[in-house]
């Protein structure tokens, strides 16, 4: 067999071709590896960039929320200044610019999302009674105040309307002693309510001659003392100035000292609570093992004995299943724990909580009926003693008999020499 030799030139060419193929494969592999590595790096870069964007957005949201919190804290004060109106306006404008997510981040010393966000009713139903053209005779109704719109209109407004109906020849006007609340209502609802100085200045500017100040306060406590001091500074601006009694009248010497005012209040609030609960009588409620607890605010003032006197009054009336308590636990026997113990020892299994306050505002909605662990409702439930705990969120001011008691106090002041 003849073997045809392969020319040397072809052998070298074939080798070069194989070499080129190997080089090409190597280059392709390298390119693929670099591509894969570059791809992974690109995704990592994108992830990092995305994270940074999210963090920047979160920081921006918190910054906007913190700004509003600062503006709210600035108006959460008891003193009115020349800047108050502008501060109230600025706080609301800043709040309105926030997104829903940003609003949830608002948190300050006193600021929270509820300051502007909580629905407390229609502010337009409330009359701030701050107009001029007062005339010579004015009844200035002074309240601590509340930012709860419905309660302000029904409870404080209820007393004011009753007084205006009873004394058509007098002009009824309003003042709040809590500037914190005045600022809250103004900032949120653009409703302007006079503080004591503003109301008294308005009376002077309108030429009022005879001024009767009717406080809606429960007792002769710290708020009542501050009221009398403020009025004293304007005493020489009017021909006559008279301050009527608070709801419970004179304090008395000890916890056994009761009076006609306390008896009238005890009867009125108990009757209203029994009716609201659907019972024919207090005795009928007792037979079903139901007790009523009226929760007041409490105070460190010497007038705190008024709460003990109200408990004495309930007992004097034979209201064995009615108890008095206070948020502050002053006096001590009105603290929540003490009241729970009293009901437990008496064997009551059903409890109805109702505020002993002129308005059903923050204390009634949160401290009494709220869902937090420290609310009265929650503490009664946590005790494990009772089968049911119900709440009645209604202020004293909406009860007709209470309104008429204020009317009587105003008449007594008018008649006083």
Task: State each model region's role.
Residues 57-120:
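Beta-rich interaction/scaffold domains
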